[in-house]
Amino acid sequence: GFYRSISVESNLAYKRRISEDTLIWWFKQGVSAQAVFHENKETLETGLQELSDWIGNDKFTIWSNGADFDIPMLAHAYTQHGIETPWKFWNSRCYRTYKNLPGAKDIRLPAIGVKHNALSDAYQQAQTVCAIHAELFGKKKAKV
């Protein structure tokens, strides 16, 4: 999977904001999740370029836990930096919607890795999507 830790300064330089609620939320998380504050940082622009390179082409399907938060913020960051968004808007998917489909609500997998680490959360969500798909459509579970 793809993971980068982005500097706060590079976000603030483009007038991106950090809410007080978000800071309070982070202070309430476990030590393992807070380790993100001690990682080597990249600029937002570098992270966006590397994500584009990792995605590779615009046929990529992008998922997030909510259609109106992560993907729009990421798309806005691309626009601010003058970088083309590496996915087409019609290839955006919502994990929250998928996990609440009829017949899927009881399918919950245990957390994988560090709770609230972006890569761990993404991996767990991808595993859950595969399990839901297998349950709803009778297919063998795909591996992520």
Segment roles from a protein language model:
Residues 45-49, 96, 120-127:
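Short, contiguous clusters of charged residues that form electrostatic/catalytic patches at enzyme active sites
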Residues 86-106:
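Short, flexible loop segments at boundaries between secondary-structure elements
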Residues 1-65:
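Conserved non-catalytic scaffold segment of RNase H-like nuclease domains
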Residues 52-55, 68-89:
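Substrate-recognition/cap helix-loop segment adjacent to the acidic, metal-dependent catalytic center
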Residues 40-51, 70-73, 77, 94:
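Amphipathic alpha-helical interface surfaces
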Residues 58-68, 72-73, 106-144:
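Acidic, Mg2+-coordinating catalytic module of metal-dependent nucleases/exonucleases
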Residues 18-20, 102-110:
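Short, surface-exposed amphipathic charged segments that create phosphate/polyanion-binding patches used
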Residues 50-53, 72, 76, 100, ...:
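Residue-level signal for well-ordered alpha-helical scaffold segments within enzymatic catalytic domains
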